[in-house]
């Protein structure tokens, strides 16, 4: 009879000294995700997941809370230096930057990656109220 060896699996948390903070602000919501330089997501948060509902999800307070939660999760995993990618036209973009700075992370660069058309598709008709 063959004896099988028991495999012992060690679970270790990886340390991520560098990372990228992706902040997407829309007119209705805020999404924040923190990834390593390769693009693998370490931590994320959204204003809906933080407990804000309906039109309150797009406020600067919601942006600050959402950013703080996502970045604190990443700091627990050893994050120290970040690049910031901001996209979208929503409110609270500056609030998110101040929040990342206040949490003690070193910011290496800030990029605005909002997609802008070079006169591509025709926009939808104007809203009349």
UniProtKB/Swiss-Prot annotation:
It is found in: Plastid, Chloroplast. GO terms for cellular component: chloroplast; ribonucleoprotein complex; ribosome. Pfam families: Ribosomal_S11. Its main location: plastid. It comes from the Eukaryota. Keywords: Chloroplast, Plastid, Ribonucleoprotein, Ribosomal protein, RNA-binding, rRNA-binding. GO terms for biological process: translation. The lineage of its organism: Eukaryota, Discoba, Euglenozoa, Euglenida, Spirocuta. This is Small ribosomal subunit protein uS11c. It comes from Euglena gracilis. Belongs to the universal ribosomal protein uS11 family. Part of the 30S ribosomal subunit. Gene3D superfamilies: Ribosomal protein S11. GO terms for molecular function: rRNA binding; structural constituent of ribosome.
């Amino acid at each position: 009879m063959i004896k099988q060896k028991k495999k012992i699996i060690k679970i270790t948390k990886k340390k991520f000294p560098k990372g990228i903070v992706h902040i997407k602000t829309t007119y209705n919501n805020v999404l924040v995700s923190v990834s390593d330089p390769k693009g693998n997501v370490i931590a994320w948060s959204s204003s809906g997941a933080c407990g804000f509902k309906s039109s309150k999800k797009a406020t600067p307070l919601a942006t600050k809370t959402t950013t703080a939660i996502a970045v604190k999760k990443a700091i627990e995993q050893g994050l120290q230096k970040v690049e910031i990618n901001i996209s979208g036209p929503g409110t609270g973009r500056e609030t998110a930057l101040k929040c990342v700075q206040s949490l003690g992370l070193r910011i290496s660069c800030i990029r605005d990656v909002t997609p802008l058309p070079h006169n591509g598709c025709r926009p939808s008709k104007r809203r009349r109220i």
